[in-house]
Amino acid sequence: MGTHVTLGLDADLLASGIPSKIRWDYSRYPHLVVFGATGSGKTYFTRLLLAKIGKWVPHAQICVCDFKGDEDFAFLSGCPDFFRFERCSEGLEAAVKKLEARQNGADPSRSFYLLFFDEWAAYLNYLDKKAAEEAKRRLSVLLMLGRSFNIHVLISQQRVDAVYFNAARDNFSVIIGLGRLSREAVNMMFSDFREEIK
């Protein structure tokens, strides 16, 4: 398996009868962001990806922060690394503490660790301004330093405006847009490919 997780199949090649896998090499491209309008399949995709990580990445630890707090991740209730709604701050803190423990040598392991945050933008909008800025700062540290310690971030939300990530948005090396994307979203996240995306 190495350091790869299959994300899906190449649609163009599949249309020609060639099932070619699209893989995420998390050692080279540590962080992912998934975005799309309501009903675009973000939750389905992220649940499938988390299941693949759990099955195929040895000793993976996944911290799930479900700010939406509906039934999509309710099956995780009771799990120690599952945080809903207001408790998502605890999940973010746990990920930062994991990074700090690996930095200072208290945790010498380098096993795969993923912070998954569903509806990051809604979470920030829920917080007061000072708390939101602190949350963005903490996420930025994970995005900028996590790769060296095998710590990864997966964010799922409707829009990926820079305001939600400070200067760290460019640290998302895998960007997945689902559903019918607006021209603005295409220009913002896929400017190099905007002519190819219809």
Summary of predicted features, one role per range:
Residues 1-21:
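N-terminal pre-Walker A segment at the start of P-loop NTPase domains
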Residues 37-38:
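The conserved Walker
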Residues 42:
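Conserved lysine of the Walker
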Residues 45:
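Hydrophobic positions on the alpha1 helix immediately C-terminal to the Walker A/P-loop
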Residues 59-61, 110-114, 146-155:
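Loop/turn-to-beta-strand initiation segments
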Residues 61-64, 68-117:
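Mechanochemical coupling/switch segment within NTP-driven translocation systems
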Residues 91-103, 134-158, 181-182:
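Substrate-engagement module of ASCE P-loop NTPases
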Residues 157-198:
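Conserved ATP-driven motor cores of ASCE-family P-loop NTPases powering translocation/secretion/packaging/pilus
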